[in-house]
Amino acid sequence: MEIQNIVASVDLKGEVNLDECSVILQGEYEPEQFPGLVYRLEDIGTVVLIFRSGKMVCTGAKNREQIYKSVERVREDLEKKCGVKFHGEPEVEIQNIVASIDFHVPLDLDTIAEVLVGDEDVEGIEYEPEQFPGLVLRLREPKVAMLLFYSGKAVCTGAKTEEEPEKAVKKIAEKIEKYGLKLTG
C-alpha cells in the first residue's frame, strides 16, 4: 500500500491580503477564476490554497510531516514576507487520505459484488462495468471507499488516518477469502 495524497484543511488564525501576497510570494491568484491563492511549495511537494479568511487547504502530501512542514512554511512566509498577523496556533485537520493498493492477483469483480452485497460491514456496492470498470465498495468502518479493479489494483479514498486504508484492505481481503476467493499472490 502506498499513500498517494493527503489533503488537510488549516485555519491559520489570521486574515490574508491575497492581492499583496500573491505578488510577494509569486503565487497564482485570479479571483475571477478562483477565490484562493495557489502557492506551490515545490521543495516539499505540496500545493497550498490560501484564502482571504486565513483558511487554507494543503494537498499533494504523502505523509503528515509534509503537511506540517507546509503549514509552517506558509505561516512563516505570510508573517515575514507579507506582514500577516496571526492570533494563535494553526488548526490542522486531515480531510482525506488516498492510497493505492496492489492485491497482486486479478479480482473477480462480479463475484465480489455478489458475495459482499448485504454484508454487515459494507455500506454500499456499485458495480456497473458498462459505466466504470471498477467496483466501488463503501465500508462502514473504517468509513472509506475502495475502488477495486480486475487487474488487482485498488484505490482507497476517504480515510482520515494512515492506518484506515490498511484496515480497509485487511477487512476486504478477509471477507473475500471467507467466501472462497483467493487474494494471495
Curated annotation (Swiss-Prot):
Highest taxon above the source species: Archaea
GO molecular function: DNA binding; DNA-binding transcription factor activity
Function field: General factor that plays a role in the activation of archaeal genes transcribed by RNA polymerase. Binds specifically to the TATA box promoter element which lies close to the position of transcription initiation.
Pfam families with a match to the protein in the record: TBP (PF00352)
Gene of this entry: tbp
Sequence repeats: from-to residues: 3-78, 94-176
Family: Belongs to the TBP family.
Keyword Transcription appears in the UniProt entry: yes
Name of this chain's protein: TATA-box-binding protein
Biological process terms in GO annotation: DNA-templated transcription initiation
This protein's UniProt keywords: DNA-binding, Repeat, Transcription, Transcription regulation
Disulphide bridges: none
PANTHER family: TATA-BOX BINDING PROTEIN (PTHR10126)
